[in-house]
């Protein structure tokens, strides 16, 4: 499979504009440098995989990247693979999530026929337990659908030729502290960073290696 940049949006696509993105009730904090870098990469590769440990913020970052670039695509489809346990069913589950009818038990073919030359961004979230199946489906779709781009999240890369794998870094000290404070305020609205507690907050974030989920869980215990 050859490497090429995603094409410009097409107005002739029959696959109408829909942005099926998850809704988060908390504010996205920081990651300005990461968003800038990923904005460059998503415009230069057709398969971008965000990798990293659980809780590192892959899903949230993917959501923000997709939302920021919604105008590039006729459609954005988001598929959470976490509930899928059978690798054989991945094509059917993806088709179902995208509201594409399973045509005679051939879900992969139905995906190809429906997406066709649509300018689409497909987000495959939580691929790690289905890496081989996700890689096979992604490669099949990319080969058959020339205007399709895929943004994946996984604890490990899919291993497809021309894939760009990008390791999500931990939050920096200031961003980690800001996240802690905002999440702590959900349970204790009066909480704020002060000269008295700032050292302790930063120490907690450092001990948690800047992992967003771990910081959020710790902040939720503030009373």
Where would I find each of the regions flagged by the language model?
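Aliphatic-rich helical/repeat scaffold segments used for oligomerization and domain docking
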Residues: 1-223
